[in-house]
């Protein structure tokens, strides 16, 4: 019985919701704002060299499309990611190579109705 209880707790921990970092990473690598927007909350804070504010999902998608048009991505790699102590939020830090420049990307995810959605994205030139 103790083994069953341990296995159940282990399975519950393993199946806890996680942000889809593979899909987010692939969308950033391709510069695909539409694919990335699937993981946006209804409002998202976007910070780049030219914008800084809270935007609707549609506005944020448009702003990122403009960014990816002027700075065509050629690759993205995650350098760090993890969960907050409360397990209700996650972060991801990565490097985007785009338009001949290197950018540091910070993404903050928050759990909303059982799914992790992007609440904040910062794109800063390295």
Model-derived regions, located:
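Short beta-strand edge/turn micro-motifs at domain boundaries
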Residues: 102-126
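Short, well-ordered alpha-helical segments enriched in acidic and aromatic residues
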Residues: 32-43
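Bacterial Sec-dependent N-terminal signal peptides
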Residues: 1-20
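Surface-exposed, charged secondary-structure patches
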Residues: 62-101
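Extracytoplasmic
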Residues: 39-41, 73, 89, 102-104, ...
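A short gly/proline-enriched turn/hairpin at secondary-structure junctions
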Residues: 46-53
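Solvent-exposed, acidic/flexible segments
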Residues: 29, 53-57
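Short, aromatic-enriched amphipathic alpha-helices that serve as compact interaction elements
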Residues: 17-32
């Amino acid at each position: 019985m103790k083994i069953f209880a341990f296995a159940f707790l282990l399975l519950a921990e393993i199946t806890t919701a996680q942000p889809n970092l593979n899909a987010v990473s692939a969308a950033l690598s391709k510069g695909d704002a539409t694919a990335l927007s699937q993981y946006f909350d209804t409002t998202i804070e976007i910070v780049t060299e030219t914008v800084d504010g809270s935007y609707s999902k549609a506005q944020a998608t448009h702003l990122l499309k403009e960014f990816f048009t002027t700075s065509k991505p050629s690759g993205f790699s995650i350098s760090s990611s993890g969960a907050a102590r409360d397990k209700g939020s996650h972060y991801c830090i990565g490097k985007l190579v785009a338009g001949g420049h290197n950018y540091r990307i910070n993404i903050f995810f928050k759990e909303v109705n059982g799914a992790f959605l992007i609440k904040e994205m910062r794109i800063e030139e390295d």
